[in-house]
């Protein structure tokens, strides 16, 4: 079963090739047109362990790999790496359920996929007979960078460069990245916001591929962002895990719908929920929760995507995005029309906006609902959830919780609700403290200790240990400097 570019049906790739390439040659994303037609036993999947679920789901989405191969890759990726054996536990909070995706090695939801991607990529290299070194380029709004470097750290045959917006991530997120160890990791701040960094990374891919700038040099580029299908596919697993937990608790019977509320920036996490739905999981409504950068809220409500608007730096920086790359995959999968998608993406590049046809808008609105939440209300929500339920959530989760309540008010006949919690509150301790009515004092580590004293909830060990780690990465670049920087690093034999 081949993947194809969202912009050109003639550009196809096997799942292994799609993982290695990251982006299609024309700048489109790889998608599986026959996703809904896969023969997948979703009910049996609910009876398996989390690793068993991952094996079945990834075999369905990445058919180049045998069941035995995938089983080994999943075991290597997840065994002993997370706080709990089920990787992503669910917690009843009030009348809703919180899906905790931050129990991995970097305390963010990206760990689920980025623990898996290096193993998939290494296996894909062997399947495709590729001897070149893989150079991973990744733009991050905060969490992807650290999780990607943690996953690829000292993996043979790979190097990774992470670009983050200078001043656009939390102090803890920055500390996680600039102290990253490993001989094959590199981090650079980019002057501008996340969209600037992400657009520049895509331009590097296009320039290097279009002009063969690395031809014959033993290096090929790939991505660890959710534009890479190998990054996106593992995220489908926790939708099944959450549903199985609700069945086990008696919240739903098998076959009854569940609504999922997802804090959304680049549209990858919520798109994984759509994939789960296409595989048969009884997903009701996928609720897209945005912060003040509410371009997706407006799009889902109106069918018009318009990035020509103010960009806000918020307390939920992983959602500070105006160009949501994975939305392109959804447009392709719902329309089946790669020419339409190519036209819309051209309009976005040239005009900064596009509008989808009415029929496509109605399809989107039949599956998705959207709401947004500003910074002040985010912090009030943190305090309210703590006071009412004694549950401590980070800023992104607070946005999702707030939008979940909006959704339930607007839709009284809603199904049971699962709120995805994407990061530990200790990654954003100052904002969380403000939400609890306290003033943050001192550096990020002192603030973490302050939050621990106030709540009695211990900070993750991986975050506490940052204080002792030396800063290794200090590069700051303009966007125009990124291509020469990548070409130079690609040719360096040793980085450290």
Task: Please report, for each region that a protein language model flagged, where it lies by residue.
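PLP-dependent amino-acid enzyme catalytic core
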Residues: 1-496
């Amino acid at each position: 079963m081949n993947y194809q570019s969202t912009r050109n049906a003639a550009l196809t790739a096997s799942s292994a090739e799609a993982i290695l390439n990251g982006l299609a040659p024309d700048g489109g994303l790889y998608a599986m047109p026959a996703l809904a037609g896969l023969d997948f036993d979703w009910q049996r999947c609910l009876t398996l362990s989390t690793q068993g679920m991952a094996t079945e789901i990834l075999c369905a989405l990445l058919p180049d790999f045998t069941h035995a191969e995938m089983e080994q890759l999943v075991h290597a990726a997840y065994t002993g790496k997370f706080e709990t054996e089920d990787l992503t536990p669910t917690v009843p909070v009030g009348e809703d359920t919180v899906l905790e995706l931050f129990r991995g090695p970097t305390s963010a939801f990206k760990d689920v996929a980025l623990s898996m991607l290096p193993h998939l990529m290494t296996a894909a290299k062997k399947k495709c007979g590729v001897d070149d070194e893989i150079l991973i380029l990744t733009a991050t709004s905060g969490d992807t960078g650290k999780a990607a470097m943690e996953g690829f750290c000292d993996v043979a045959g790979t190097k990774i460069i992470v670009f983050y917006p200078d001043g656009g991530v939390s102090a803890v997120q920055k500390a996680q990245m600039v102290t990253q160890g490993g001989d094959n990791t590199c981090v650079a701040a980019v002057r501008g916001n996340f969209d600037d960094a992400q657009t520049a990374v895509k331009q590097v891919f296009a320039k290097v591929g279009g002009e063969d700038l690395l031809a014959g040099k033993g290096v090929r580029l790939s991505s660890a962002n959710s534009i890479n299908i190998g990054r996106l596919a593992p995220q489908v697993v926790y939708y099944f895990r959450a549903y199985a937990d609700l069945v086990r608790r008696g919240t739903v019977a098998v076959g009854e719908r569940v609504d999922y509320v997802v804090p959304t920036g680049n549209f990858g996490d919520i798109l994984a929920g759509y994939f789960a739905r296409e595989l048969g999981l009884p997903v009701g409504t996928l609720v897209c929760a945005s912060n003040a950068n509410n371009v997706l809220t407006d799009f889902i409500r109106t069918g018009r995507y318009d990035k020509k608007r103010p960009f806000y730096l918020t307390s939920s920086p992983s959602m500070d995005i105006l160009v949501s790359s994975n939305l392109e995959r959804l447009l392709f999968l719902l329309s089946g029309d790669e020419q339409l998608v190519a036209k819309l993406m051209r309009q976005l590049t040239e005009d900064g906006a596009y509008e989808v046809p009415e029929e496509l808008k109605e399809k989107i609105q039949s599956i998705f609902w959207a709401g947004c939440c500003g910074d002040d209300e985010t912090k009030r929500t943190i305090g309210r959830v703590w006071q009412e339920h004694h549950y401590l959530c980070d800023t992104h989760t607070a946005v999702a919780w707030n939008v979940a309540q909006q959704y339930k008010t607007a839709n009284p006949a809603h199904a049971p609700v699962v709120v995805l919690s994407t990061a530990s509150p200790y990654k954003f301790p100052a904002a969380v403290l403000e939400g609890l009515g306290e003033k943050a004092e001192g550096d990020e580590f002192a603030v973490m200790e302050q939050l621990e004293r106030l709540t009695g909830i211990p900070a993750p060990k991986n975050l506490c240990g940052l204080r002792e780690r030396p800063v290794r990465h200090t590069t700051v670049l303009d966007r125009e400097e990124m291509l020469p920087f990548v070409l130079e690093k690609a040719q360096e034999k040793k980085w450290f």
